[in-house]
């Protein structure tokens, strides 16, 4: 017997389900005992500090109930992304009703005792968060920081052609920059190879204490707005459930059938033209089904519904009857049996097994997660038999490796960026793939654009690139986001949120592992001579270093072979944010592929061919982390050795900067004995660093050796020559060499003439670039001679 999913009888069950979800959601806000009000409510039943939000809840529960309906009707593989920031009860309540919550947390049983635990734990010490945190079944998006819901949904459905991301977007959230630009995602979803996103704009009209822009915008203008971005909005509006249920059911059916028609046409006819995707605009009051007013002020349909709408807590029970009336308005006796279990007629309409949105495998590590099939990075090695003689562009070399990663992993590896793949010299990838771009293509003026491709960089938005990558890796696939170093700061808060997700998810036994999030910082601070001061900011290194060390890796490979070795490590890793600072410009190549591998595996190494201490106690230790720091340090060592051949110099190259931290701060950190092996206990260390200097000072603070002289980025920059950026920050060879002399008191007299020579060279540099517009021949043509 077929089911009529639009019949009044079926929709009545949907209404009961919705009321049950609302009841659970209110109970989680206020109660810690007596969950079904089976006795009179007393103070000890109520939380001391009810914490959470109400305004978005009933609208989202309504949407969730109707998504369950279309899952049943059409046999969908669908998952839920909760964009509105403050609605943690939604996914908890619905996953509890469908049984997923109890499957994962068996102590939260589907009875009175389990319901009591469910209520008490919400926004409670030792309990669960008030957002859709990693503890929440079915969530890949916490929603604490607003704006990324559509980006995450799109990233998740890329290369998942059978999946639909039901993304609920708050009308307040839609005012954020990242969300506003993410509506353009239609231009990047290929209906042949990818799944679909069904955005549902939860238009309740208010934010914390202001109206929303969409809330005061007519349907006609909203329609025009979304149509301009290839969405077809379907409008549903009302506050009477008897009318809104059939209206939303009809709208959901229409949306799903349009999605299916788009995909059927595309897949059967190989038609990859840009479709017009459906979306739903759902207007219902903020705080729907809650208190209408309080103390003469409007609650439902106003900003006042945002958080805790009525003042009831354990210490103030004056208005407890209002809370009881609110809870009983959902008629819990029609919804739950006396033992707290859900009534059978409601259970009948809930999807089962993996069809439950909270149990969809995509939301827990992916549908079919696979490790990458990686080529042997050694096959791409650059010849360094004569150190520094070979000049290559690291990113071009690496792009050949990435090209073959794509070939070997055609369905689960992607590159993301904000229109910078070519600028960052990843040319090789386009030998095997294109940029995914669903808009019109003009062959005479476009390059590498196609409806299908493994590169998504055709939207100039760091937020989109980062959000897509996050959605992609949180659903079990692999990729990287390459961008200009300075403008990765645009998304450093997103990186923080991703770290927080990883940390919490890793603490849950039931959460599967995620591939790492790989961030490539190119066009770096000491290479931004042509774009100038605005493009010079290495601060993401410091920002990420402040996070829990188990989840953060920072690599500063000095040449192409080091970058190849780093790539092999990051693509095999899990549950990390790998931040790689690398070069795209022509540069001398230093380390053999085996040297590079050892440097990456150990994090650092003493470079024998650039050291003269022969394993004995050095007079001076030079350390370098980064491309320009390595070049300038080697040049400084050459200058010193030529003038002071008896000076015992040790050169330490650092690739994994955080490996230098104390094991008290970082489990991977070098022991004091290991640290002293490289840096000694008291000899002067001249450390050339790619980033802000305090990161290195912080590392040395816990160590024996405080005889440290750091040369990093000192917030000096301009449009000038490449070498002059280093001079401005005293991270050049002449200043490094001077620092080495100044750090050795015994050299005060014998080194005076040398220091003067260095000052003369700096003066010559300053005069020359202002006349010639380029760097000194002594700089541009410098070659490593070796240490005899």
From Swiss-Prot:
Keyword set includes Transcription: no
GO biological process: carbohydrate metabolic process
Cofactor(s) listed in the protein's UniProt record: thiamine diphosphate
Catalytic activity, EC: 4.1.2.9
SUPFAM superfamilies: Thiamin diphosphate-binding fold (THDP-binding)
Induction entry: Induced by sugars that are fermented by the phosphoketolase pathway (PKP) and repressed by glucose mediated by carbon catabolite protein A and by the mannose phosphoenolpyruvate phosphotransferase system.
Catalyzed reaction equations: D-xylulose 5-phosphate + phosphate = acetyl phosphate + D-glyceraldehyde 3-phosphate + H2O
Keyword Lyase: yes
Keywords: Lyase, Thiamine pyrophosphate
Subunit structure: Homohexamer.
UniProt xrefs under PANTHER family: PHOSPHOKETOLASE-RELATED
Family in the record: Belongs to the XFP family.
Protein name (Swiss-Prot/TrEMBL): Xylulose-5-phosphate phosphoketolase
């Amino acid at each position: 017997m077929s089911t009529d999913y639009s019949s009044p009888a079926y929709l009545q069950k949907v209404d009961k389900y919705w009321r049950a979800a609302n009841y659970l959601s209110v109970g989680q806000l206020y109660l810690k005992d007596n969950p079904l009000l089976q006795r009179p409510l007393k103070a000890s039943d109520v939380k001391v500090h009810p914490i959470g939000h109400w305004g978005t809840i009933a609208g989202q529960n309504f949407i969730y109930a109707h998504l369950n309906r279309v899952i049943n009707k059409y046999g969908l593989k669908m998952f839920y992304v909760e964009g509105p920031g403050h609605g943690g009860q939604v996914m908890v309540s619905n996953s509890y009703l469908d049984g997923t919550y109890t499957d994962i947390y068996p102590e939260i049983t589907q009875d009175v005792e389990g319901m009591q635990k469910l209520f008490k734990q919400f926004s409670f010490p030792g309990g669960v968060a008030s957002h859709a945190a990693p503890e929440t079944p079915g969530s890949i998006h916490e929603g604490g920081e607003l704006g990324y819901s559509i980006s995450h949904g799109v990233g998740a459905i890329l290369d998942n052609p059978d999946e639909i991301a039901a993304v609920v977007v708050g009308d307040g959230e839609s005012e954020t920059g990242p969300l506003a630009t993410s509506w353009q995602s239609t231009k990047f979803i290929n209906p042949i190879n990818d799944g679909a996103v069904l955005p549902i704009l939860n238009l309740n009209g208010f934010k914390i204490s202001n109206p929303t822009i969409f809330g005061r915008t007519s349907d006609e203008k909203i329609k025009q707005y979304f149509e301009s971005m290839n969405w077809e909005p379907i409008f549903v509006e009302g506050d009477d459930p008897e009318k809104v249920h059939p209206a939303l059911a009809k709208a959901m059916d229409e949306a799903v059938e349009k999605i299916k028609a788009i995909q059927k046409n595309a897949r059967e006819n190989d038609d990859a033209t840009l479709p017009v995707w459906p979306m739903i605009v759902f207007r219902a009051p903020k705080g729907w089904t809650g208190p209408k007013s309080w103390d003469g002020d409007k609650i439902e349909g106003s900003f006042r519904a945002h958080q805790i709408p009525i003042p009831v807590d354990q210490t103030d029970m004056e208005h407890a009857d209002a809370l009881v009336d609110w809870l009983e308005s959902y008629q819990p006796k029609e919804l739950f049996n006396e033992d707290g279990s859900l009534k059978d007629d409601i259970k009948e309409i809930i999807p089962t097994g993996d069809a439950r949105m909270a149990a969809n495998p995509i939301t827990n590590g992916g549908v079919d997660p696979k490790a990458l099939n990686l080529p042997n990075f050694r096959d791409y090695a650059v010849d360094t038999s004569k150190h520094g003689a070979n000049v290559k562009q690291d990113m071009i070399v690496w792009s050949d490796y990435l090209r073959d990663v794509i070939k070997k992993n055609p369905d689960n590896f992607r590159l993301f960026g904000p229109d910078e793949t070519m600028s960052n010299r990843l040319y090789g990838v386009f030998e095997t793939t294109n940029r995914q771009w669903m808009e019109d293509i003009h062959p005479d003026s476009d390059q590498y654009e196609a409806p299908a491709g493994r590169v998504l960089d055709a939207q100039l938005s760091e937020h989109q690139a980062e959000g897509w990558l996050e959605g992609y890796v949180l659903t079990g696939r692999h990729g990287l986001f390459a961008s200009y170093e300075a403008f990765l700061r645009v998304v450093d808060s997103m990186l923080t949120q991703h770290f927080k997700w990883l940390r919490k998810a890793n603490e849950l036994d039931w959460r599967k592992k995620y591939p790492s999030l790989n961030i490539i910082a190119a066009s770096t601070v000491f290479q931004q001579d042509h774009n100038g001061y605005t493009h010079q900011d290495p601060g993401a290194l410091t920002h990420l270093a402040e996070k829990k060390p188990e989840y953060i890796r920072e690599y500063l490979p000095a040449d192409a072979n080091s970058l190849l070795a780093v790539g092999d490590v990051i693509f095999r890793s899990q549950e990390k944010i790998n931040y790689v600072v690398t070069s795209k410009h022509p540069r001398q190549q230093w380390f053999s592929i085996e040297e590079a591998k050892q440097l990456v595996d150990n994090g650092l190494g003493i470079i024998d061919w650039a050291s003269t201490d022969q394993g004995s106690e050095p007079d001076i230790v030079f350390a370098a982390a980064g491309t320009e720091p390595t070049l300038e340090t080697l040049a400084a060592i050459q200058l010193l050795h030529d003038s002071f051949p008896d000076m015992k110099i040790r050169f330490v190259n650092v690739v994994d900067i955080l490996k230098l931290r104390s094991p008290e701060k970082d489990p991977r950190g070098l022991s004091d004995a290991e640290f002293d092996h490289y840096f000694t206990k008291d000899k002067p260390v001249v450390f050339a660093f790619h980033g802000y200097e305090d990161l290195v000072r912080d590392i040395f603070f816990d160590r024996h050796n405080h005889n440290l002289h750091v040369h990093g980025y000192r917030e000096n920059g301009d449009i000038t020559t490449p070498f002059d950026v280093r001079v401005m920050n005293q991270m050049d060879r002449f200043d490094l060499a001077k620092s080495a002399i100044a750090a050795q008191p015994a050299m005060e007299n014998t080194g005076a003439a040398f220091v003067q020579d260095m000052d003369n060279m700096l003066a010559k540099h300053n005069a020359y670039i202002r006349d010639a517009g380029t760097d000194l021949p002594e700089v541009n043509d410098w070659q490593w001679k070796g240490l005899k």
